[in-house]
Amino acid sequence: MSSMYHRFHAPHDFKIEQVTFVHGDVWNVNPIALKRVERLFCKNERAVIQTRLASGEALTLVPVAAILVASLRLHFLDLTLNAQSCGPTVFPCDASVRKGDELGWFEHGSTIIVLAPDDFEFCDNVVENARINAGQPLMRKAGTNPL
């Protein structure tokens, strides 16, 4: 049994406005590969999930594919995003999700990049190269409770 959790969840209540699938490579995303492959996250296949918080602020999630991860599933889209898809492809979306809802999963596992507004900050327990656990708070808007 793998120690990795390959599913990902909504970090907050939000509306999903659009998903852009960007076709690319499937390099490994381990620390060694990150040092060797320049702009690796910009080269690998990825899905740019554009969302809007109730406050009106944008929050973007970018699940990035990796070696052995040739497909990505999103519950709110009735399709599999994978190497057979041509990209970039834009999928308009109008799905509302609640904090903790499962958004999708990787067939094997990978990385998710979070692009948040400037007034968001990491929680104190988030440190470089540390393992993140499902349900662990990652970010918060300055002066508020964690996402």
Specify the residue positions occupied by each region the protein language model found.
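Contiguous, well-folded functional domains in the mature portion of proteins
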Residues: 1-147
